[in-house]
């Protein structure tokens, strides 16, 4: 489309959910906004300008039927126009509609379009500006006017410019537009028509007379008001009359005009929609003349229609224009209506029977009007189309309920249930939950674009209360049983009635409208409204009903009011009589307490949540009311004032609850106490609302109307008041058993998820709910009080078995909560406490749903305005002001204190958890790191992990390795996911988590998979853990004392066994639970927002069995079995799955997990699987042992390196040395370590009670044991002579040579066997387990069919990264070729085969360290251990093959190489191994070498080796760069045979590259020529290539 050509110079500003367009684009997009099908709302700013009147003059009353006073009000269009449309969204939304309908052909006829501000200018033009009209221009313009079919946007721009310059063009183009306005699409089946008036009316004489009458009035008024300006204004009357004709023709004819409605009160934002009579909206008198209706006939009513009550349409046939359609107080013009043809259904449905029409009723331009409504109904061609047109002409939404035949037939489910079920059934909740989604036509629409409907709000309307003499409503007659009583009421008294229409419409989908009953009540009525966007924000002027519709914040403050009347309204709520039968309802204690707190049930707008407003009326005892109302006689007594209860919302399930309640006794009323009910607000899910004035006033300031709209329009939460009565029925049964059978699951859910419709239940796939949880307080359980419940936004199935903490949460006596219904919602309530919520996702549909819900979470959960305000309140109120009160209550319970300096920092530091023992006072300071923002914000959850000192080290190292090395972030995620989905370890080890208390801080490990469980367990037992591990406790008595304190009175601590529940610790408990709830909720949101957490069907973390089984074991064993202790003071839970060591074993934050004494270290791709030990650091450097892990390439340069099956490397602290010595079996071995090592190595137990020792530790032990004894020299000689020998295939250890081992039988057996041997041999068998890579680069080159250039670039960059790390450590590979480059399963390239690698001694830094390294490299020399040769050398000079592609033979000869690489020239070598890679060994004494003699000659593969490596004595690390150049040539050439490949490589050694490579890849050819240069000083180094990274190929 043409939108793509636009230059976007300025960024779009996002403000309060509205997106504004740049000023330069406004002319383009207003055209689309006006013409877009489906009611797209465009905003156009029009400013009203009024003259200031003098102070002395009285203000004149404005009557809108005359034009005199209206001359003062001048409307003009501002230049600065803002729209709510983003061109990005317009592409996706509107233009999709245009493509589907092929509506572009239609739009070509809209080239002459008129905007509202231009109408105003044309009307009022003679009053403020006018110029002389020249006759010459008329002749010229007549020739130019033709039907021009041009592009959309160019025409609109040209027309607007021309109208500003030329006035005559405007007239004729307007006339041309309204003459040729017949619309037609490509198919002739449908014509879009505006039905308010037809061009036939112009022919009527009555209309013409009325127009003349209007002209005379206007001319007289004009002359009176404008006598002064007669000289300047020439031909004023003629121009005005001509324009007045045009305007009237526009009104009578078909037109397209847009009306405005104000959205926000503060900002000047308007919605404009199609409106008839916008120009003459202020003229009351003219409207009667235009439509040929007498003023007196508006309020007459045809009484003959009262008799026909059975037929729905008989009353409609007799209607005339004098019927009741306009109210007395109505100041708006006669509203019109028009048909839209919806954009979605054209291409999908062929027949007219399935096509869809939307009925849009107009609305007032005044601010007090409630809202606009959009009703949709399906239309069948067979039905009387013309009759429906006539009905819709005279339809007025203010006071009539007449809709189409389809709407009348498709009444609401509530209405049908009430008619069918005349008896008082108890299943009212079921009926209320059956919404309009049962319509069969919905299922025809399968795939709906979600982006079209995101920005459209739902319009839910309620008509005004009106005073009418004679009331008749055809639809609602059935709702009332006694028709005779109603007629008597009509005759005797004027009645006020309410019409409640709750109509949900989106742009593309059709729903039926449903209505609630009409209640005839003697007094004023509060009208419930499901508040939508226009309903909230359109109320500006002072209206009598504004207090009912739109309560202000000031009126309903949280403070208790001083007046008695307002107190009643704040505390008591009532329900109306069900069907006006006089049934009395009285509430039980729970329900009444629920409704005492009005602010808890109110939403952010000051309106009540979703539809659950409960009104209140007090009816006085009037005799007239008793006589008039037969239905209310039962309720009223002669002596007392009775109260009426009524619900306006029929959705609420409370009706069922109120029915079943019994009367309370008078004694209970007297003994009532004020009790608090906590309610979860939608905006602050984890918010604790304290009963203080400051809190409530500050929170109310946050609750603005704009934020409320975002919640109410996008997300309606169905609120359950849960209560089970006599074990008969429960809401969960109704929801999950009966109602699901009525809904088609497959069709509905796909639509509902895609459309963001406000849904009250999502069936069994996902149920959107928030709970109110309240427990009656008994005398025996005074300590238990209600707490806030965490309410995540997505639930499906909740599985809570009775095993959770035993069954001790269930009250045995009164049994309020029951565990009868398993795998249902009712089971959830049985265990609701602070954080006893787990999410159990059982269906794949939820993953799709969560993706769609991310926008809603970001929409109203992650706004900073809420967080910052509440943060200030929280810190000021509870941390600073209440420090003194908290310090008093330190006995036997933790309190949380915060300083003034810390509350503004990033983390709250809740200081000083105090604990007192019975005998001795032990005070421990534990710094608990918590979140800054006490609200839901995702980035701070990650900040909790990163803020700790120990975790910072891990994160820094991990990030460095990600940036510097080949490992990418995807690989890191895969490692975490492997642990997460149990690919690396069995299912038992799912729930293993370790608490780290280091330096008095609670440290959370960096692994993301364990955050959820850690925080959960910290809440349940965190304080216990902190108390246990604060100091070293060795004796069992002390441990038992601490446990006795912590688990005091277990029967009383049913909900929180580790915290006392006394009155003095209220604030501390609230702060604790507040902080903990937020962290867990943050992590739940974090799980919901990440894709890879919920991809699988059976998620391990979320599985019910494992969560419940392991967690109950941990908590129940720890709290309920305090006296059970294992050996060595180690508490083991979950079959050695979770280790809690009382001896303060620190599981240090290098992501080490103890799984059955098997530590897992994840190196990038180096896996040591001996007894499940894995290295978890990406690059572990053991330089002291000369074990080099360089980018997953292992260097083994020593001849004596020992590995054992049970080698484990652990990190512990120095203070735990004694414990580890005791835990070892061999207590005689002292503990001592090397000082040079960065990591200290300790001992731990093995499976077979053997010592697990590292290589360096083993050498240290041997040396220290030998040097301990008095006979050191003798034993050294004996060792050298070979008297002591212990041969084993797997293990050799000399630690048995100890004085204490003399009593050991095995010691004497060794002596007897080896006593005769003069020479002993110590055999050390080296076992190296390495990663298996399936393929090599050579296989990749041979097997590929086509050349993948991007893959070649990746391979080269990975090789450069490997060479960079090798060369930084002064190592030369010297045998780099495709067969030595491996490719792993993750397509990561790895360099291997370091058999020929050596140090670059020519490097100047290595010359000084030469002597040191030689000594340190030979550990056998230091430890006095005899040398051995690991490799079996081949002394004979036998020939061998270098490579399978080159069959040249190499022998000892001193011939010069390198005239032609492929000729048979032999390489001078010395002793040669049988493999292709070989090394030089001698048994002779070493001679002193010069610097040039360090590197051997003739090493490497002939083809890939550099020339100086084969000939010269001196070469450097540039040797590897030469072979890299040949590998690049090999990658970028494809050959069919090996001979072609060898020729290309031989020519490349002479810098002769193939022609195709130079043509297709010139940059790669330049790189190869540089790397293949004979002078190694000219070659690029690995550092230079690594620094360039992406710019490697640019030179």
UniProtKB/Swiss-Prot annotation:
The gene is eIK2. It comes from the Eukaryota. It catalyses: L-seryl-[protein] + ATP = O-phospho-L-seryl-[protein] + ADP + H(+); L-threonyl-[protein] + ATP = O-phospho-L-threonyl-[protein] + ADP + H(+). Its EC number is 2.7.11.1. PROSITE patterns: PROTEIN_KINASE_DOM, PROTEIN_KINASE_ST. This is Eukaryotic translation initiation factor 2-alpha kinase 2. GO terms for biological process: negative regulation of translation; protein phosphorylation. The keyword Nucleotide-binding applies. The chain crosses the membrane at residues 29-46. Phosphorylates translation factor eIF2alpha in salivary gland sporozoites during dormancy, which leads to an inhibition of protein translation and accumulation of stalled mRNAs into granules. Belongs to the protein kinase superfamily. Ser/Thr protein kinase family. GCN2 subfamily. It is an enzyme of class 2 (transferase).
